[in-house]
Swiss-Prot record:
The protein's name in its UniProt record: Ornithine carbamoyltransferase
Pfam families in UniProt: OTCace (PF00185), OTCace_N (PF02729)
Main location: cytoplasm
Annotated binding of carbamoyl phosphate, by residue: S57, T58, R59, T60, Q82, R106, H133, P134, T135, Q136, C272, L273, R317
Function statement: Reversibly catalyzes the transfer of the carbamoyl group from carbamoyl phosphate (CP) to the N(epsilon) atom of ornithine (ORN) to produce L-citrulline.
HAMAP family the UniProt entry points to: OTCase
Enzyme Commission number(s) from the entry: 2.1.3.3
Intracellular or extracellular location(s): Cytoplasm
Catalytically driven reaction(s): carbamoyl phosphate + L-ornithine = L-citrulline + phosphate + H(+)
GO MF terms held by the record: amino acid binding; ornithine carbamoyltransferase activity
PROSITE patterns, alphabetized: CARBAMOYLTRANSFERASE
Length: 331
């Protein structure tokens, strides 16, 4: 059956069927190949796209701007909107929907991007919220397909760290939809929400996926095709929480030893970035000097190893985001 996503918003992979996700991945592969061959499209020619950011970003902004421009769109970047302050989300959505053909939102609440989509009248794309990160997952799956050389349904992906965060949940949603084996690996005190686990396990009955939580590193990583992690602390959080968080998560740091425990020399290391993997950032140095905390979630050796595909992931943000825009707002 043909897939038609015209006019659809892209808020979470939970809204999409496996066939629709497959369509977006296939389109991403195609657009990337054309880009490499110097062939740019015009699917968004004459279209206007607005990027609405509450949270800063390097990859998301660049991916949307480059992807839209390469398909012929004009892009506006907004960081100083009065949305939710002097103007309601509903009113902002209606105004932007009159001027733009697509709206990207990167911010805090999932309810905000959902409210925008409800009232805008044009496709709204989730560039990240505290609850989800669907565009990142498309890039991750594209990268896995490029490097693992087998179907997603045969992939075992282990996310290690704080398994309650948006990346863990977003990967879980995608894995459940695409029939993958997903393991959330971390301390029991940072276990995913039980309701979300049950919801994903229900999806899995239809797709053949396996979704599970483990606190045992040796058992969880055995046979893994992918080890994935994310930063442990987010700026803006209460610093008094950091020592306990780091203590809890240090056993789940991605090390060469952990990679070796997979028993698979080709296990991929993945990370959505930014990463604390060395001491070459002000934040990492500050945490070390001022609080005596090593917040590095991955060893530098692993981050820079041949198993690491983190910069392929970063590039693939553009190709997959371009695919989402073309599929939903293109001509």
């Amino acid at each position: 059956m043909a897939v038609n996503l015209k006019g659809r918003s892209f808020l979470t992979l939970k809204d999409f069927t496996p066939a629709e996700i497959r369509y977006l991945l296939d389109l991403s592969h195609d657009l990337k190949a054309k880009k490499r061959a110097g062939i740019l499209g015009d699917s968004l020619k004459g279209k206007n796209v607005v990027l609405l950011f509450e949270k800063t970003s390097t990859r998301t902004r660049c991916a949307f701007e480059c992807g839209a421009a390469e398909e012929g769109a004009h892009v506006t970047f907004l960081t100083n909107s009065q949305m939710g302050k002097k103007e309601s989300i509903e009113d902002t959505a209606k105004v932007l929907g009159r001027m733009y053909d697509g709206i990207e939102f990167r911010g805090f609440k999932q309810s905000t991007v959902e409210e925008l989509a409800k009232h805008a009248g044009v496709p709204v794309w989730n560039g990240l919220t505290d609850a989800d990160h669907p565009t990142q997952i498309l890039a991750d799956f594209l990268t896995i397909e490029e490097h693992a050389h087998k179907p997603l349904s045969e992939i075992k992906l282990v996310f290690t760290g704080d398994t309650r965060n948006n990346m863990s949940y977003a990967l879980m949603y995608g894995a459940a939809k695409m029939g993958m084996h997903f393991v959330a690996l971390g301390p029991d005190s940072l276990k995913p929400d039980e309701d979300i686990l049950k919801e994903m396990q229900e999806y899995s009955k239809e797709t053949g996926a396996t979704i599970e939580f483990s606190s045992n590193v040796d058992e969880a990583v055995k046979g893994a095709d992918v080890i994935y992690t994310d930063i442990w602390v987010s700026m803006g959080e209460d610093e008094s929480l950091y020592p306990e968080r780091v203590k809890l998560l240090t056993p789940y740091k991605v090390t060469r030893e952990m990679m070796n425990k997979t028993g698979n020399k080709n296990t991929l290391f993945m990370h959505c970035l930014p990463s604390f993997h060395d001491e070459d950032t002000e934040v990492c140095k500050d945490m070390m000097d001022r609080l005596g905390l090593d917040i590095r979630e991955v060893e530098d050796e692993v981050f820079r190893s041949k198993n690491s595909v983190v910069f392929d992931e970063a590039e693939n943000r553009m190709h997959t985001i371009k695919a989402v825009m073309v599929a939903t707002a293109g001509k």
